[in-house]
Amino acid sequence: MSRKARDPIVLPQGVEVSIQNDEISVKGPKGSLTQVLAKEVEIAVKGNEVFVTPAAHVVDRPGRIQGLYWALIANMVKGVHTGFEKRLEMIGVGFRAAVQGSLLDLSIGVSHPTKMPIPTGLEVSVEKNTLISIKGINKQLVGEFATCVRAKRPPEPYKGKGIRYENEYVRRKAGKAAKTGKK
């Protein structure tokens, strides 16, 4: 049994959970999210708590799927209540970003313009031309888009130039050592 899923998910004030057929929907002040449920879990809502238990017919390691759905529902509750945010910083001469309508325009030292469509449900803002903030209620969508932006120019280990998560540690390498020795 999953250790986290032993505890119920406590619903904050203003968040509602409803279960219909094989689908759970969570509504809150920031929006609503839905998730299709597997047949291996049973969800029960009692007051302001949500309980995730394995179904009676599951024999083979029920904790795996139980822990997965506990985490998915907990992230949905947190997303519709407070939301999620990922921040990226661009390091390099001439690196900058701008939001143009529903596109994120990146100048990252390549010969062609790099424009990325912003997925619906996300709010992207740029501060100081080099700090990108990605906000949304769906944790998976926020993380996936942040990873796609970072993958356009990941930080390189010699000078550290590129796009990185805020406060991400980039392991640095030493450059070529000066030649020494006899000729």
Swiss-Prot record:
One of its GO terms (biological process) is cytoplasmic translation. Keywords: Ribonucleoprotein, Ribosomal protein, RNA-binding, rRNA-binding. Signal peptide: none annotated. GO terms for cellular component: cytosolic large ribosomal subunit. InterPro entries: Ribosomal_uL6-like, Ribosomal_uL6-like_a/b-dom_sf, Ribosomal_uL6_a/b-dom, Ribosomal_uL6_bac-type, Ribosomal_uL6_CS. PROSITE patterns: RIBOSOMAL_L6_1. One of its GO terms (molecular function) is rRNA binding. This protein binds to the 23S rRNA, and is important in its secondary structure. It is located near the subunit interface in the base of the L7/L12 stalk, and near the tRNA binding site of the peptidyltransferase center. Belongs to the universal ribosomal protein uL6 family. HAMAP family: Ribosomal_uL6_B. Part of the 50S ribosomal subunit. This is Large ribosomal subunit protein uL6. The gene is rplF.
